[in-house]
């Protein structure tokens, strides 16, 4: 008789403990229902990268002095710099510049250490191709702005915006060269 009563007490305690566990799980579920989703519907919605995002490298051919600092600081010696020495002006003249983004680790060292700031990181992150040789960008492909920035009608160049009046020392509200205008 006592064993039956002890068994019922034990059963009741286990049932209460199971109900607590279910209740705790339900509270966690309710807590997560109030949060915003962390994923996006990628092809239809695009992630807006942060200002310091390290995407595809943009190269300005006219600024480059062929010093090869970018090659020396690159952990994998990736940028290929072809230059020739012009004896008349006693300076190097850049002939070709290329980066293979199939190998690049996007560390940003080349951009950080470039003395003439001819390299910069863009916000472009869609570099997928069917052929890996298409990821080898020469100076012409590196010099192009991302297509999304060029063709987007909601983006306006800073040159088209009004400038600050004279005597005002505060910074401009648009801190970047390319600004997203929201209507």
From Swiss-Prot:
Gene assigned in the entry: ndhI
PROSITE patterns per the UniProt record, alphabetical: 4FE4S_FER_1, 4FE4S_FER_2
GO molecular function, one term: 4 iron, 4 sulfur cluster binding
Sequence ranges assigned to domain 4Fe-4S ferredoxin-type in this UniProt record: 55-84, 95-124
Organism: Marchantia polymorpha
GO biological process, one term: photosynthesis, light reaction
Pfam families, sorted: Fer4_7
Entry GO CC: chloroplast thylakoid membrane
Main location: plastid
General function of this protein: NDH shuttles electrons from NAD(P)H:plastoquinone, via FMN and iron-sulfur (Fe-S) centers, to quinones in the photosynthetic chain and possibly in a chloroplast respiratory chain. The immediate electron acceptor for the enzyme in this species is believed to be plastoquinone. Couples the redox reaction to proton translocation, and thus conserves the redox energy in a proton gradient.
Protein name, UniProt field: NAD(P)H-quinone oxidoreductase subunit I, chloroplastic
Cofactors, names only: [4Fe-4S] cluster
């Amino acid at each position: 008789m006592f064993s039956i009563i002890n068994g019922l007490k034990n059963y009741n305690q286990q049932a209460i403990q199971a109900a607590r566990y279910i209740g705790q799980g339900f509270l966690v579920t309710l807590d997560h229902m109030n949060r915003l989703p962390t994923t996006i519907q990628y092809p239809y919605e695009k992630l807006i990268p942060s200002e310091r995002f390290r995407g595809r490298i943009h190269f300005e051919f006219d600024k480059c002095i062929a010093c090869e600092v970018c090659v020396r600081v690159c952990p994998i010696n990736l940028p290929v710099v072809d230059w020739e020495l012009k004896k008349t002006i006693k300076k190097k003249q850049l002939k070709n510049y290329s980066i293979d983004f199939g190998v690049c680790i996007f560390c940003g060292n080349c951009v950080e250490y470039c003395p003439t700031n001819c390299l910069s990181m863009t916000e472009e992150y869609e570099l997928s191709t069917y052929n890996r040789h298409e990821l080898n960008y020469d100076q012409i492909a590196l010099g192009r702005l991302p297509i999304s920035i060029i063709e987007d009608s909601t983006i306006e160049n800073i040159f088209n915006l009004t400038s600050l009046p004279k005597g005002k020392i505060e910074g401009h509200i648009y801190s970047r060269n390319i600004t997203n205008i929201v209507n």
